[in-house]
């Protein structure tokens, strides 16, 4: 027997909400089958009038109770700083703050990077995002609750369900998409403290990242229609791997499309299988355009916030349609007390070098690859569009620029001092490229000279054909098919360990397929090396 249905985080029901989750839409069906007279209570801490109206209509709520949003004692500040300057500001000021807090970032890569910098500066910090082991995340939360660590550097993955009554500060390393996103996160500070503060920084990379999130917040119309046609042609139950093999989209996008189609009744799911229903379906492109435009307006509002000369609290509350608004008297614009942005120049230089050394490991693909044909562990020099990856992006955009000496020297330093693979490479080869073949070869020749090993020209060639760029292949089924039977390895290549160079790595399938052929020719070890890692960097 149902006495009361409580829906927490009710903003997730609304397509206008900052954290819309399609599965929450199924609650409408639950409400409709409740016994007559069973009350429904929908709760949310952060929602503007549009979200409230949407939730009210969907759930069928008769009355609305709305309290004031302002958090007394929460001092707000905002400023613009470059990447290196933000790192230095954090490492300089965090040790002076009482208690513990959160630094919010937009991407998993930034969470890892900022946490690593803080650790190297002697600050107790942990990264927190969806790729952190699920068993480790509760441990990080508890250590933050117990104030055993100074700061957690987190994506919005540290969100719903986390309640720390004594957080002293919340700092945003980058600007979130909307006022609702921001207020939900900064509002975690000082819930049981008299005084707390929130600092928002705007960086040059914010716009590109937020635009990507907005553009990918809904499934792609063409891909969704393609998926529905696949289900119609299949005529029965299929698994997700079958969908991945048929629709050229990333796994995350496939999951999102499947969820939307199930909620919309276009397909049904039982266990791990899906099939088309008899229900009519069409892609609602009008609502997608409307919501996307609204998100652009919300992003513009956050740009205004950074430049706001009046009360910052008042600005946020008005944007959230709070009827109980007044000036706070304690934000930077009310008090006249602004952030101290003076920074130690040698430390900024150190941070700039740290950002350029944004390298990582290229783990070999193991599944379905025979053990004696697998690559060894490789390295990438940078993240796409970050640090030295900015130079790689410039060459991809304009090949005439060429890969400069700084990339050669940095690659040599990484290979000889940080990586030092054993047994060491005895020759160098490059992945054939239609667009950057000569530029990549010129880079490889200079690097080989610095490493004092030979560069073997034409060790690997590409068969004639009209091949699609690998970057357009969105999941492993398409990525592997696109490079299989595409390359030829010369039968008389050296048998010693090889440093196999490509400009950019994403899926690792190009390295994997060429590596398999090299190993079949008797090459002792294949070490992949890429100038930039583009995975997750779009």
Protein language model annotation of sequence segments:
Residues 112, 504-514:
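Acidic, divalent-metal-coordinating active-site segment for phosphoryl/phosphodiester hydrolysis
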Residues 335, 350, 354, 512-538:
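PRPP-dependent phosphoribosyltransferase catalytic core
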Residues 166, 171, 175-184, 190-388:
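C-terminal accessory region of SF2 helicases/translocases
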Residues 74, 348-427, 436-437, 441, ...:
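Active-site-facing substrate-recognition patch
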